[in-house]
């Protein structure tokens, strides 16, 4: 099983670009940069897209331009157009339950209250069995503060940790294609930015 679509979740527009909720898009932006495959807006897929080759595999990159809670529209449209199955999709998203500086791969599971994941599961026919890259952003400590927290910008010290985890996640994504998911997961899950 090869990954054919890598998605980075975000809200569109300059006012959201540096917010924690856009951590998934930061990862896809970095992959596109590392592999010299600039993202271009493609309205028919409701997002910015690019095409990369990893170890001979053709992979699409996607950052939806819909708002977060409508991410499934972009993912579902692209998956349907290219006949990509849920287990061939990797969705990168911000994760409240991991601290900044940590990122983890995961297959399947619920949406954990994440509206982007919720909409993707729905638009994939209620199938949650896609891969996720959970990018740790930490938790404000009070569930009533979550919305303001994810839509806020991390302080410089936290941003540095998040960026380092995303950099390691990009390297581990390439390792996944070279040596398999088990090896990539083992390496990523032992990483913690200091």
From Swiss-Prot:
The record marks 94 as: Stabilizes the basic form of H active site to accept a proton. Keywords: Cytoplasm, Hydrolase, RNA-binding, tRNA-binding. InterPro entries: Pept_tRNA_hydro, Pept_tRNA_hydro_CS, Pept_tRNA_hydro_sf. The record marks 11 as: Discriminates between blocked and unblocked aminoacyl-tRNA. CDD domains: PTH (cd00462). It is an enzyme of class 3 (hydrolase). Its EC number is 3.1.1.29. GO terms for biological process: protein quality control for misfolded or incompletely synthesized proteins; rescue of stalled ribosome. It catalyses: an N-acyl-L-alpha-aminoacyl-tRNA + H2O = an N-acyl-L-amino acid + a tRNA + H(+). Monomer. Belongs to the PTH family. This is Peptidyl-tRNA hydrolase.
């Amino acid at each position: 099983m090869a990954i054919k679509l890598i998605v980075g979740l975000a809200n569109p527009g300059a006012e959201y670009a540096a917010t924690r909720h856009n951590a998934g898009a930061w990862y896809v932006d970095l992959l596109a940069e590392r592999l010299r495959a600039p993202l271009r807006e493609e309205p028919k897929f409701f997002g910015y897209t690019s095409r990369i080759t990893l170890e001979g595999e053709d992979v699409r990159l996607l950052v939806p331009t819909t708002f977060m809670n409508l991410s499934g529209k972009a993912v579902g449209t692209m998956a349907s157009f290219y006949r990509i199955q849920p287990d061939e999709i990797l969705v990168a998203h911000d994760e409240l339950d991991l601290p900044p500086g940590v990122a983890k791969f995961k297959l399947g599971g619920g949406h954990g209250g994440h509206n982007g994941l919720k909409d993707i599961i729905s638009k994939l026919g209620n199938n949650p069995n896609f891969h996720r890259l959970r990018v740790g952003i930490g938790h404000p400590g009070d569930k009533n503060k979550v919305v303001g927290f994810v839509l806020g910008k991390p302080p410089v010290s936290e941003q540095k940790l998040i960026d380092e985890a995303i950099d390691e996640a990009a390297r581990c994504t390439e390792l996944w294609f070279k040596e398999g998911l088990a090896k990539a997961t083992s390496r990523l899950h032992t990483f913690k930015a200091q």
